């Protein structure tokens, strides 16, 4: 199989028309002819056929998959196939329990920082579940040995707490501060005993899952004490970095994402320390 998963280019696709014929001969621009074997097949995975000519379309069978039909479940199923069966069974039930109800709650009551047209929620849901998988991989990585096997067995309760922690920042990471309590309330209703015990004014965003105790802990416990730099006579105010709850949890999330070789995007207005947080993490 030759799989071409890029866009259909109007010029490049014309050279492949002869390959799609019964004779399967590729004619290059310099006049060379390459004969394809009878067992070779070509498959195209473009986003659309805007630049495809009728000659190309008539030579290929077309399978159209709507984004509204695909959803996030095939993505999750593909990832769970790479996990141990016992773990995959637990995670499958957690995806079924939380993802769709939380998406529904967010669509009804919340507004993300990066909004879009009403139909764009499909792609956004897909991206948020991708982020959820990335954070789960980052959290599970600390419980795996060098060969990817489990160092120790994890309880279903711990899996659920870990899932709630990852859901907080994957599905709720782009919410306005005023909308976070709405998502947190719905997560508490679904999580039950697996949710942290918190004050009425607090949300899931103030808590993380401690890997040693396997219990919820407040992010304030991770904020180091800041000491004034007495070794400098006149410290430069613009260069002083004082650890806060926000900076500590952003650094922890960056660590989880980069540990599985993924990228992160910080969203926020000017002057919210996005660049400073990344530079501090890279230092």
Where in the sequence are the language-model features?
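AAA+ P-loop NTPase catalytic core
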Residues: 1-3, 81, 95-283
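E2/UBC-UEV (E2-variant) core
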Residues: 38, 67-111
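Intrinsically disordered, low-complexity regions enriched in proline, serine, glycine
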Residues: 12-13, 28-29, 53-56, 72-75, ...
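The conserved Walker
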Residues: 8, 60, 270-271
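A short helix-turn-beta junction within AAA+ P-loop NTPase domains corresponding to the substrate/partner-engaging
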Residues: 21-25, 52-81, 86, 283
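Core residues of folded domains in eukaryotic genome-function proteins
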Residues: 22-24, 30-32, 38-42, 48, ...
């Amino acid at each position: 199989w030759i799989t071409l998963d890029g866009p259909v280019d109007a010029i490049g696709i014309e050279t492949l028309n002869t390959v799609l014929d019964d004779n399967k001969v590729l004619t290059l621009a310099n006049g060379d002819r390459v004969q394809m074997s009878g067992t070779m097949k070509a498959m195209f995975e473009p986003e659309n056929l805007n630049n495809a000519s009728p000659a190309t379309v008539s030579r290929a069978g077309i399978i159209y998959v709507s984004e509204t039909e695909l959803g996030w479940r095939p993505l999750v199923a593909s990832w769970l196939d790479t996990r141990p069966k016992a773990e995959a069974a637990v995670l499958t039930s957690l995806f079924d329990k939380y993802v769709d109800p939380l998406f529904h709650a967010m669509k009804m009551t919340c507004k993300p920082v990066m909004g879009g047209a009403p139909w764009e929620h499909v792609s956004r849901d897909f991206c948020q579940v991708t982020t959820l998988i990335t954070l789960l991989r980052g959290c599970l990585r600390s419980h795996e040995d060098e060969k990817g096997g489990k160092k120790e067995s994890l309880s279903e309760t711990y899996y659920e707490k870990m899932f709630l922690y990852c859901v907080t920042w994957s599905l709720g990471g782009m919410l306005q501060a005023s909308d976070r309590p709405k998502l947190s309330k719905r997560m508490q209703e679904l999580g039950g005993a697996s949710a942290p015990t918190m004050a009425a004014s607090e949300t899931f965003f103030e808590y993380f899952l401690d890997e040693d105790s396997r219990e919820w802990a407040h992010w304030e416990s991770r904020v180091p004490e800041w000491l004034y730099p007495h070794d400098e006579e006149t410290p430069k105010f613009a260069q002083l970095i004082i650890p806060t709850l926000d900076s500590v949890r952003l650094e922890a999330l960056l660590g989880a994402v980069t540990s599985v070789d993924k990228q992160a995007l910080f969203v926020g207005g000017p002057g919210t320390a996005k660049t400073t947080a990344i530079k501090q993490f890279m230092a």
